[in-house]
Amino acid sequence: FCACLTNNRPLSPRLFFFPFFLFIRKTHWAYADYKHVKELSSDWANVLQPIVGWSALGCNKDASDSTVWLGTEGSHTPLHQDTYGVNLVAQLHGRKKWLLFSPDETVNLYSTRIPYEESSVFSQVDVRAPNTSIYPLSAEAQPIEVTLEPGDILYVPKHWWHFVEALDTSLSVNVWVDTPDDAGDRAKEAIARVLVTSLA
């Protein structure tokens, strides 16, 4: 699949009908993000199991607990903060740029719950082109930049802000690991969900 996207042409007649091929790589990017392995075919877990050994890192998780992120060059996840757990990310194909910001930077990143997504707090700042006249404190934000290459694993601490962009056609998997103080954060998220759904 990754080779197919990189060449911008189908490798088999079956893939010709894949929706990504309706768009030109130079002007569009495609992102299959946040896809839970358990919801995909069982083949995904079988293929990933020997590659992604979360238990070797001390986690009580296996490949079926993972989430898949597959995208073309330029695909990205906007700057956000996960509200609970820590994040382990394994880069399997291609490269991804990560911009990480400490939770201490929250005031500089202008957090918002719009759009609402359970367990995510977004930043109003577009880190690719920050508008410092609207968000002046964003000029003070100090990111840590990391480029993940195949075989790399990144540990994202709890509540750290992150922006992620594929530098090439990219495949990565991640797993969220619970922390002892997640119960309180999950309760806050449940309250936020009730409030948001009551407004709909």
Which residues fall in each region the model found?
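N-terminal accessory scaffold of Fe(II)-dependent oxygenases
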Residues: 1-153, 161-200
